[in-house]
Design a protein with these regions (language model features):
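Active-site catalytic loop in hydrolytic enzyme cores
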Residues: 2-18, 41, 66-93, 243-318, ...
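Asparagine-centered polar/low-complexity signal
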Residues: 106, 165, 245, 337-340
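Soluble catalytic regions of membrane-associated enzymes that act on cell-envelope
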Residues: 139-271, 292, 297-315, 321-328
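Membrane-proximal, cysteine-centered motifs at transmembrane boundaries in secretory-pathway
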Residues: 317-320, 324, 331-334, 338-343
């Protein structure tokens, strides 16, 4: 915000602290509700009920933080257990269910140290033993990584990843970053011979109709053969339908190039949240509102794979990724994440 937006340094720091405070507020409200309810309902002498209440309030706070104001789900407590003894529960109850169990166990352990709750120590010990036993059972009996069926070889696709390393503050500057992007990616897309080529988000920083004469047609012709395909970040759309942050797929046999439009947009980067236009004016960045793609867009099919693109931080929203598996027959075999600095 300060380096690229010109916002006063003190205000930029204040904005970051305000965001951190807002995210912490969910848990503060959950803790306040826990104290109020345990006091009002007389649960102070019922550690098991109190632990379940705490876990429920904690989970509600995480659900709210993961969905309200565009959502910040990637800090959910369940993710901390991806390599821990509770990991096997994820396939049954999801990340929020794992977080609920962890919060309940943590509450029982904390309550077990309360001098007035002697029985809680026994309950906490039992809960810990149950958790360890369940973990051992899970490690012994559950395979968390899907294996190919007997006699079925996993599909292997050779991929070339392109990265032009165009500085972010120059990427959309006419005559410098734009020219560098078009030149470098144009040369690489023409020269590379890998079966599948993947470029980053907005690798081509112009709409197809804004590209130099013959540039887009040359790319379409280059990938009209049967042996190669490309996935490339390109802005698409028009004033009437709206502009989208998109990934196009080029391969033979298409009437129109494959298209994936980013669904989960970045607040202040790709859309302006309601009531915050004053903040955008203060940031001094010429932002506009992008149009959203739909949830569960089709995959790009190539060499037996169904490749599901997503853009930038979309890979943090598990529920939206899971929506692409609604139809098992069209479910992705792999995700392809592209961002403005990587893939």
């Amino acid at each position: 915000m300060h380096t690229y937006g010109g916002l006063n340094a003190a205000l930029a720091v204040a904005a970051v602290l305000a965001l951190a405070g807002l995210l912490a507020l969910y848990y503060a409200l959950a803790a306040a509700a826990f104290i109020a309810l345990t006091s009002a309902k007389g649960l102070m002498h019922h550690p098991l009920r109190s632990a379940l209440l705490f876990a429920a309030l904690w989970t509600l706070a995480e659900l709210a933080r993961g969905s309200w104001f565009t959502g910040f789900p990637w800090g959910a407590g369940g993710y901390a257990h991806v390599d821990g003894p509770l990991a096997f529960l994820a396939r049954y109850v999801g990340v929020y269910g794992v977080g609920f169990v962890a919060a309940a166990l943590a509450a029982l352990l904390a309550l077990g140290g309360h001098v007035r709750w002697r029985r809680a120590r026994t309950l906490a010990g039992m809960a810990l033993l149950l958790a360890l036993g369940a973990a051992l059972w899970g490690w012994r009996h559950l395979d968390l990584q899907a294996a190919p069926a007997a006699g079925q070889k996993p599909l292997v696709t050779e991929v070339a990843l392109m990265q032009g390393n165009i500085p972010q503050d120059e990427k959309f500057v006419p005559g410098t970053g734009v020219l560098d992007s078009l030149t470098w990616y144009g040369e690489q897309l023409q020269a590379n011979r890998a079966p599948l080529i993947v470029g980053p988000e907005t690798a081509l920083p112009l709409l197809p109709r804004q590209l130099p004469d013959g540039y887009w047609d040359a790319l379409l012709a280059r990938y009209a053969g049967p042996d190669q395909a490309a996935l490339l970040g390109v802005p698409l759309g028009d004033m009437e339908a709206g502009y989208t942050n998109s990934v196009v797929g080029l391969k033979a046999g298409q009437a129109e190039p494959y298209r994936y439009d980013k669904h989960h947009l970045v607040p202040f980067g790709e859309f302006i949240p309601p009531f915050f236009r004053w903040f955008v004016r203060m940031m001094n960045i010429p932002l506009g509102d992008f149009a959203r793609g739909s949830v569960g867009q089709p995959s790009f099919e190539w060499q037996g794979q169904r490749l599901a693109p997503n853009v930038c931080y979309e890979d943090l929203f598990g529920a939206e990724l899971a929506a692409r598996f609604a139809d098992p027959g069209a479910a992705p075999t792999a995700f392809v994440n592209v961002s403005n600095i990587a893939w």
